[in-house]
Amino acid sequence: MNHDFQALALESRGMGELLPTKKFWEPDDSTKDGQKGIFLGDDEWRETAWGASHHSMSQPIMVQRRSGQGFHGNSEVNAILSPRSESGGLGVSMVEYVLSSSPADKLDSRFRKGNFGTRDAETDGPEKGDQKGKASPFEEDQNRDLKQGDDDDSKINGRGLPNGMDADCKDFNRTPGSRQASPTEVVERLGPNTNPSEGLGPLPNPTANKPLVEEFSNPETQNLDAMEQVGLESLQFDYPGNQVPMDSSGATVGLFDYNSQQQLFQRTNALTVQQLTAAQQQQYALAAAQQPHIAGVFSAGLAPAAFVPNPYIISAAPPGTDPYTAAGLAAAATLAGPAVVPPQYYGVPWGVYPANLFQQQAAAAANNTASQQAASQAQPGQQQVLRAGAGQRPLTPNQGQQGQQAESLAAAAAANPTLAFGQGLATGMPGYQVLAPTAYYDQTGALVVGPGARTGLGAPVRLMAPTPVLISSAAAQAAAAAAAGGTASSLTGSTNGLFRPIGTQPPQQQQQQPSTNLQSNSFYGSSSLTNSSQSSSLFSHGPGQPGSTSLGFGSGNSLGAAIGSALSGFGSSVGSSASSSATRRESLSTSSDLYKRSSSSLAPIGQPFYNSLGFSSSPSPIGMPLPSQTPGHSLTPPPSLSSHGSSSSLHLGGLTNGSGRYISAAPGAEAKYRSASSTSSLFSSSSQLFPPSRLRYNRSDIMPSGRSRLLEDFRNNRFPNLQLRDLIGHIVEFSQDQHGSRFIQQKLERATPAERQMVFNEILQAAYQLMTDVFGNYVIQKFFEFGSLDQKLALATRIRGHVLPLALQMYGCRVIQKALESISSDQQVISEMVKELDGHVLKCVKDQNGNHVVQKCIECVQPQSLQFIIDAFKGQVFVLSTHPYGCRVIQRILEHCTAEQTLPILEELHQHTEQLVQDQYGNYVIQHVLEHGRPEDKSKIVSEIRGKVLALSQHKFASNVVEKCVTHASRAERALLIDEVCCQNDGPHSALYTMMKDQYANYVVQKMIDMAEPAQRKIIMHKIRPHITTLRKYTYGKHILAKLEKYYLKNSPDLGPIGGPPNGML
């Protein structure tokens, strides 16, 4: 009964969370937020309570507090203080309120150290909350969470939430973005706190406003204020609290809301040990061991949160069990309510649960072995924290540290080495071992293999966020026992193992095993490895090993982790080949290059495995398919992981970005292992999960922007002396980047032939893609400009067959133009390219991009090869001449084609001269004939203009043609045009006067003054002189006066007796 009563107290603590320590006075201006009720939400208090739940360190930086969450979790901002909103929890709340511990023993010290009225920095009000960003992309709107909390969840079970807990209790909340009590709240409300560092509220801490990384830089102590240092004690009781959690490097969305769980990813050295009294510790252990139904308390996230933030353990459920079903619940040891599986990322089999979902086997085994394991810890006085920074090797839990997995299962796996494959071998595959989907990647990029929990082959895979995965000591020992029997490389025996104890880390060495016992399984093939081939590494450096069959990518890269026939525990070995260390080559640089692979080699990793098991790897929305679903409901990676528009799915053997490049499973994981450790590291130079491309940069290093790390560093000016040879494997990617394309263009101009050939080899396979790329097309053009003849012809052959689509494409048309300029027209490939336009001439001519290609063809190709263009223009000259793009092509024909070809074009032009001169585009064609045409063609046009000079000169477009007529006509024709203007009358005034005032015709008059013979110029002057005073009133008339002044000031004798005006003024 004592345990039951305590379980109720642990489960429901909404009011007790705040009532003992909440301040009810308000020193600030009460009218700041308007008139509100007496008892308001916690946004109304000047600062939060002294409770540890509101401590600045209990809540991650840049995480918004849930607006309006007051004394109980789902209250509105102006709600009156009242018992629980649901009647079901009223009695619990009353008991909790009565039995809540008095804070009197802590208030004094807080008042002594607190500085009331001055701590604005600690305020978590809406002003502060609005300025914070969201730590997770999955964080939902705060107000929407408040409004939908009761409506959406109250129908799942009797208590209102799928977890069997009140909506008021925020310790276990599957809604991202909501506030969750930190483990320190659990401790403080359970009873007296033995650690004075826990439970302290806003204090005048000099480090309070610094980043959390600085605050917890010391793993032993927590800087509370300037007066005292409080040390952290290790656990003192028989509870399996000696787990080593790993910090997640990204914003994690797991089973719990991590907004206020500081252990997971906000600290460099997470304070994972929450201090409890000895009595409470013993009660936890006894409750877990003796009463299975108390596991519901642990599943609610209360007790385990005080010890382990959120690791994952392998459940004992049968293969393919869906945790949403009753079978999954039974396997997870009678959780309190259905187990909620949150939105997750990476492929993990069903049955891998957070460690907080306690299991009976783990509880019993942990209770029995905790005291025995305590003596073997590497550092007894300090909880070890695994957080691999940049350049560090990934740490793993040591052999002495035990987890909350089901040790009994691991022992069973050790006793029966073929447990992991038992069902698979029994279902029609005797003697052919296929790895069940028990491997996945954790947040460090390491390959994690389930300890025999997934015994079937067809178990569905779920998506999991990059959160820690724990390894139990029993699993390690079981694997060691299995390896001792010669069945597989063990966790302790193999120096290349994925998981090895922290305390025992021998130097990296090649481990040879008898070939008779080394029956190895890779993810994509099964092969019997000999002594010359120790194991199939996940991404092997060397060429293909004898006897290995790689089903994924060719050229001998055995793309599978060499998992032994007995997968008991974590008996896996990812080692490099002993026979190929001297012949190391660039990873995936030849046959599996980005654009060289055929469609067959582009099969997604793991696709043969899933398809053979009736589980399709085709893309589908992110979800968690049930075991009963048919193929086609596979899992897909987050969209950001596909940078080349690929539709490849997320697969077991490795993450791909859609183009065959391997990427780490965890966001940010590539930064941790850039500089790899040389001892016992998966990411070392001799045994690497992701081998580097050029000593440092992995093809797996895909930044969040979708660019590789090399390109990202180059864009950030981290490589001022980058050379073309440094871009091997990245030429295409750089060509498609604005800055990278410019860099390659500049280098190609001064590159050696060998360097140009290296670049050319990479871009040739992606030539068409680069031709249509906004930046890549310039690299192709550079090769047409600076490449050798063979390179130019090779690129031209890539254009063949695609001339029309390229000609109509914005960037492809530029490539074709450059090719036509750079390659001699007598080359056969050029003639073939031009011939592809036959039948599509008019379409190209009227296209904004294609017309440039046709123009370039006319300019660069021999006219005899262009007769099909002339034939296409027959009967279309007037239409094309009045077209914005067609008029340009007509002009090119008039310039470059033979007389025989241009004659029919000119005949059609002369038939429509009067319309063309007044057209906004056709007038350019007529002007072009006047400038470059034959004299007879010019005379025809001038004869069309004569008699209409006055009218056409006042036209916006025709006035330009009249000017050209005056300029390019013969002397006799020009005299006739000028006489027409001078002698013609327009009403009471001469035509000259009208033209001088017109906005367009005045330019014709100016041109006549310039081009006229001296005798005619004198006549024009006499005609203009009477109108000088009037012309001053008109804007355009002033242009004529300026022209007259020019000639008068010359005092030219050509003016005769005219001289200046009598008054000396113009």
From Swiss-Prot:
One GO term describing the cellular component: postsynapse
The segments labelled Disordered in the record are 106-204, 494-553, 620-650
- Transcription as a keyword of this entry, yes or no, is no
Region annotated Guanine-nucleotide binding in RNA target sits at 959-963
Ranges for region Interaction with SNAPIN:
1-260
Q: In which tissues is it expressed?
A: Expressed in male germ cells of adult testis (at protein level). Highly expressed in testis and ovary. Predominantly expressed in stem cells and germ cells. Expressed at lower level in brain, heart, kidney, liver, muscle, placenta, intestine and stomach Expressed in cerebellum, corpus callosum, caudate nucleus, hippocampus, medulla oblongata and putamen. Expressed in all fetal tissues tested.
Q: Which InterPro entries match?
A: ARM-like, ARM-type_fold, PUM-HD, Pumilio_RNA-bd, Pumilio_RNA-bd_rpt
Q: Which residues carry this modification: Phosphoserine?
A: 67, 82, 102, 136, 178, 182, 587, 592, 684, 700
Q: What does this protein do?
A: Sequence-specific RNA-binding protein that acts as a post-transcriptional repressor by binding the 3'-UTR of mRNA targets. Binds to an RNA consensus sequence, the Pumilio Response Element (PRE), 5'-UGUANAUA-3', that is related to the Nanos Response Element (NRE) (, PubMed:21397187). Mediates post-transcriptional repression of transcripts via different mechanisms: acts via direct recruitment of the CCR4-POP2-NOT deadenylase leading to translational inhibition and mRNA degradation. Also mediates deadenylation-independent repression by promoting accessibility of miRNAs.
**Name of the protein:** Pumilio homolog 2
What is the native source organism of this protein?
Answer: Homo sapiens (Human)
